Curated annotation (Swiss-Prot):
<keyword id="KW-0963">Cytoplasm</keyword>
<dbReference type="GO" id="GO:0032259">
    <property type="term" value="P:methylation"/>
</dbReference>
<feature type="binding site">
    <location>
        <position position="186"/>
    </location>
    <ligand>
        <name>S-adenosyl-L-methionine</name>
    </ligand>
</feature>
<keyword id="KW-0949">S-adenosyl-L-methionine</keyword>
<feature type="binding site">
    <location>
        <position position="164"/>
    </location>
    <ligand>
        <name>S-adenosyl-L-methionine</name>
    </ligand>
</feature>
<keyword id="KW-0808">Transferase</keyword>
<dbReference type="InterPro" id="IPR029063">
    <property type="entry name" value="SAM-dependent_MTases_sf"/>
</dbReference>
<comment type="function">
    <text>Methylates ribosomal protein L11.</text>
</comment>
<dbReference type="Pfam" id="PF06325">
    <property type="entry name" value="PrmA"/>
</dbReference>
<protein>
    <recommendedName>
        <fullName>Ribosomal protein L11 methyltransferase</fullName>
        <ecNumber>2.1.1.-</ecNumber>
    </recommendedName>
</protein>
<dbReference type="GO" id="GO:0005829">
    <property type="term" value="C:cytosol"/>
</dbReference>
<feature type="binding site">
    <location>
        <position position="228"/>
    </location>
    <ligand>
        <name>S-adenosyl-L-methionine</name>
    </ligand>
</feature>
<feature type="binding site">
    <location>
        <position position="143"/>
    </location>
    <ligand>
        <name>S-adenosyl-L-methionine</name>
    </ligand>
</feature>
<dbReference type="GO" id="GO:0016279">
    <property type="term" value="F:protein-lysine N-methyltransferase activity"/>
</dbReference>
<dbReference type="InterPro" id="IPR004498">
    <property type="entry name" value="Ribosomal_PrmA_MeTrfase"/>
</dbReference>
<comment type="similarity">
    <text>Belongs to the methyltransferase superfamily. PrmA family.</text>
</comment>
<dbReference type="InterPro" id="IPR050078">
    <property type="entry name" value="Ribosomal_L11_MeTrfase_PrmA"/>
</dbReference>
């Protein structure tokens, strides 16, 4: 059936209140959306950040008269409160969501493919990965930068550390590209489970070891270290991340904005001979070879 969607303009401080009011007025679901296309990059621990200008969207049954709800918000927030009423046609939302995802190529050899799509090149290095939990699927520039970097390496027989493994996409890609062993580390137990499930789906579960930080091995001397997290943890955990690689090992870091790159280059330059920075949109990848 079709739906009525009511959008109310709010701020980060009032968004939760507006959400509760929409639910109280009979909304079947509520969604928050950035009203000004301003990204939220790096929340502090325990924060659930919202944009300074946030649209709160309530989804109502088609027979709902939106006028009383609009009048209610005008009474609370004033006559000039921003709002919009839309009629949404009924769709197969699952199918529409699935249609959004297509096989993606990274570098020369590597493809990331949803399970419901045909593999474009059966002779390529194909990683089967379905969007699911909020972990990497290759669509974000930082993941793409790391996948392209891995595709350009000779990983045959190598040991790879994937720090902040998320979905396991980088470690699984490394194994498919010839690595012998991957050690994946993440602070989130759901990420560990997602990595395990995806490794099984790709037939590499016996080559990947997955750890929470407290359980990670301390004597790793990897050939390749990749960390696609955020600038804050990359800064704070620099000695630990750098310590996972042996002399001459290769490292790639992402989850970094261009403005954050110079500081991290200086920090990691203590241990690595740094390569030129690779940039995709406003994100970048730092890479280098370990000294010694």
């Amino acid at each position: 059936m079709p739906w009525i969607q009511i959008r109310i303009n709010a701020t980060a401080k009032t968004a939760d209140k507006v959400s509760n009011m929409l639910l109280g007025r009979g909304a079947q679901a509520v969604t928050f959306m950035d009203a000004k296309d301003v990204p939220v990059y790096e929340p502090m621990p325990g924060e659930t950040p919202l944009w300074g200008e946030t649209e709160v969207m309530g989804l109502f049954d088609a027979e709902t008269d939106p006028a009383p709800t609009i009048a209610f918000f005008q009474q609370i927030f004033g006559e000039d409160v921003g709002y919009k009423v839309e009629q949404l046609e009924d769709k197969d939302w699952v199918r529409e969501w699935m249609d959004h995802f297509h096989p993606m190529q990274f570098g020369e050899r590597l493809w990331i493919c949803p399970s419901w799509r045909d593999v474009p090149n059966p002779d390529a290095v194909n990683v089967m990965l379905d969007p699911g939990l909020a972990f990497g699927t290759g669509t974000h520039p930082t993941t793409a930068l790391c996948l392209q970097w891995l595709d350009g390496l000779d990983l045959a027989g190598k040991t790879v550390v994937d720090f902040g493994c998320g979905s396991g996409i980088l470690g699984i890609a490394a194994l498919k590209l010839g690595a012998a062993r991957v050690i994946g580390i993440d602070i989130d137990p759901q990420a560990i489970q997602a990595s395990r499930d995806n490794a099984e789906r790709n037939g590499v579960a016996d080559q990947i070891e997955l750890y929470l930080p407290a359980d990670q091995p301390q004597d790793v001397e990897a050939d390749v270290v990749v960390a696609n997290i955020l600038a804050g943890p990359l800064r704070e955990l620099a000695p630990l991340i750098a310590g996972h690689g042996k002399a001459g090992s290769l490292m790639a870091l992402s989850g970094v904005l261009e403005s954050q790159a110079p500081e991290l280059e200086t920090i990691y330059g203590q241990w690595f001979e740094m390569d030129p920075t690779a940039v995709k949109e406003e994100w970048c990848r730092l890479s280098g070879r370990k000294l010694g």
